[in-house]
Amino acid sequence: MSLVLLGCSKPASKLTTVDGLESLEFKYLGSPGIVTPLELAEDLGYLAPIKLSYQGVSTGGPQGIQSALSGDSDISSPSFAGSAVKMVASGVPGTVVIAAYGTFDDPFAGYYVLENSPIHSARDLIGKKVGTNILGAQVEYMLKSYLKKGGLNPEEINQVTLVVLPPGSAEQALRSGHVDLAPLAGPAIERGGVRRLYRDYDLVGDLTTGSYVMANRYIAEHPNTTRKVVTGVAKAIEWSRQQPRDQVIARFEQILQKRKRPENGAMLKYWTQWGIPSKAAKFEDGDFKIWVDNLIEEGQLKNNQIDYKKIYSNQYNEYSQH
């Protein structure tokens, strides 16, 4: 969102304000019951004098990226890195500016079936339904990876059906039999009656899998604001590593209370880390190679078609340069 100056009709993107910043308001998307690195950065004072402007809920990575590219928000929601690779491959003018999350040995997340389900392997999923929040993102990639590693051929993989579920309904869909497998976390797992089939960490290990994307147009018009926000996010991620887990969760709970949205904070107590392996959320080519290789394997990309430096930039993450 642009800085509003009464009596001035000039677009804020062309203005220089406090500390050389082009805008003091920054539009973003959030998720109910969750605190993102961007929101923590603001609460810790790392974005000041910039204020976040909440634009609503993100339904998933691709929608979050599209929101940033269209200008509905100034940055994407934390989005699957594979979606960012597809974005660049299709020629869309956007750039990954900082990591948002990664895979790690998380006991509170995975892809689950009912405890008494006959599904015990990838092959058992043939003819079954799998719940997802959105098509073409992380759940779909990890499912296909699991099925391939389980020995399924493309024809068999196509017999596994993805079902798009409304936000927050995965557990209900699984327990009611609407789907046979669903991504679950925290409270849903603790309630029991479910069994983990696989998880992201089992498939890719420690890897940065989530990112923040910004439109190239916004970056060009707001370089100082971009630098302030991206560096602030990096600082917040490092802060979360350096503090005891219970203190980080307590901070999250305070943030939820202050923002006064209709949301349930039950997931917060299951937070352990954001799982970003690199210091200061810095990216390297290797973070994207797995997704590029997958697109090449599926025939969506040719060898050497992608210049990794067009996917991401650490230029605005000053904290990663320390």
Segments the model singles out, each with a brief description of its role:
Residues M1-L24, S320-H322:
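Short, low-complexity disordered leader/linker segments with a strong preference
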Residues L15-E155, Q159-V163, D180-P183, R195-R196, ...:
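Short, glycine-/small- and polar/acidic-enriched structural segments
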Residues E39, G45, Q66, S70, ...:
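Solvent-exposed, polar/charged alpha-helical surfaces in well-ordered, non-transmembrane soluble domains
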Residues P49, T103-F104, D202-G205, W274-E284:
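Short, solvent-exposed loop/beta-turn-alpha elements that line the ligand-binding surface or hinge
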Residues I50, V96-I98, V248-A250, N303-Q305:
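Short, hydrophobic secondary-structure boundary micro-motifs
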Residues F80-G82, V163, G168-L256:
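Pocket-lining segment of extracytoplasmic ligand-binding domains
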Residues A220-K302:
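Secondary-structure end/capping motifs
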Residues K289-H322:
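Conserved C-terminal helix/tail region of periplasmic/extracytoplasmic solute-binding proteins
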